[in-house]
Amino acid sequence: MYCIGLISGTSVDGIDACLVDISGSGLDLKVDLLRGETYPYPDALRQEILALCAGTPVSPEAIAFLDDSIAKEFAQAAQQIQQSLPPADLIGSHGQTIFHRPPNPEKAFSLGYSWQLGRGEAIANLTGITTVSNFRAADIAAGGQGAPLVSKIDVCLLSHQNEHRCVQNLGGIGNVTYLPPRSQTNWQEKICGWDTGPANVLVDLAVQKFTQGEKTYDQGGQWAAQGKPRQELVDQWLQEPFFEQYPPKSTGRELFGALYLDNCWIEAQRHGLNETDFLTTLTEFTARSVVTEYQRFLPQLPDRLLLCGGGAHNLYLRERLQYHLGSNTKIQRTDDVGLNSDFKEAIAFAVLAYWRFQEQFPGNVPLVTGASQDCLLGDIHLVPVGS
């Protein structure tokens, strides 16, 4: 089955789109990537999304218009990705997250909430292709975090017979899936995963701040590599209660966003840091937060760490991860084991759509999300009659 996967992550860079050919069933899948592209948002639309994510007051009418605008961009990406290729049978669209709130165990019946714009009904109507969307809602309704949702895809495509592996997504927010060796007894019961905290989001915001928007990220980590990290600041930032919270857990820009960055910059200036050293220290914060999370919550450090997402191209971040993990962990991108690291998240939502529509196969991992049960993920939007 030819499936399209669509997602725009917390970095709000644009829409990652892929066309894949999926065959097989359950966890025994073959997934071939035919094409992957990123379609940047128009700048005005991106700024509207970022403003809404930052909590800027917006009228219901404006949100409705933004929802439609995002759906149109997603539909256009779906149409473009399949040009000159076999037409898609199915679309899996994550949409654009504008708000994510984990469950609050201190309140009675306080489910989490996750809100994505770019409604699937509109995408199905505009493309003429059956679309699955709203993937997080079922897991959240079952008491889960609704995140991370890629872990079952990691199990399916990246687990190994003998190696302890971690798959670390370095998007705006980082998330990890721990994959014990398949040779271990009851290995699937030992899988775990969670959001590790900020990956690119704070560095991206700082780069945009310091360049007045001319640059949106630190390419290859070249800017941060020129500075010196201030470890006492990293020590201070790691006192954030999120990092000590036991998995399952998830987070987003609601915590690690523009306000958090502003507070970090104020504190950095008190310590006499310039812009370069601040970027270096933020990158060190990402590296140390990831490794500290592993040390706290994994049964052991991984034999192999597989990176994906935009941060997988940040050579300085990779260098700092290697330093803190030590030489016993080999770090690679998922490309090195056959899964495109730039479009892994888009591929994941194509697979989740396939499981939902074609097989009625649960897509979540309750050990990872905290849901009370396996769930069918996503709402199915059929092609309108007469299309």
From Swiss-Prot:
Disulfide bonds: none
InterPro entries for this protein: Anhydro_N_Ac-Mur_kinase (IPR005338), ATPase_NBD (IPR043129)
Keywords: ATP-binding, Carbohydrate metabolism, Kinase, Nucleotide-binding, Transferase
Keyword ATP-binding among UniProt keywords: yes
Positions bound to ATP: 9-16
PANTHER family hit by this protein: ANHYDRO-N-ACETYLMURAMIC ACID KINASE
Identification of the protein by name: Anhydro-N-acetylmuramic acid kinase
Species, as recorded: Synechocystis sp. (strain ATCC 27184 / PCC 6803 / Kazusa)
Organism classification: Bacteria, Bacillati, Cyanobacteriota, Cyanophyceae, Synechococcales
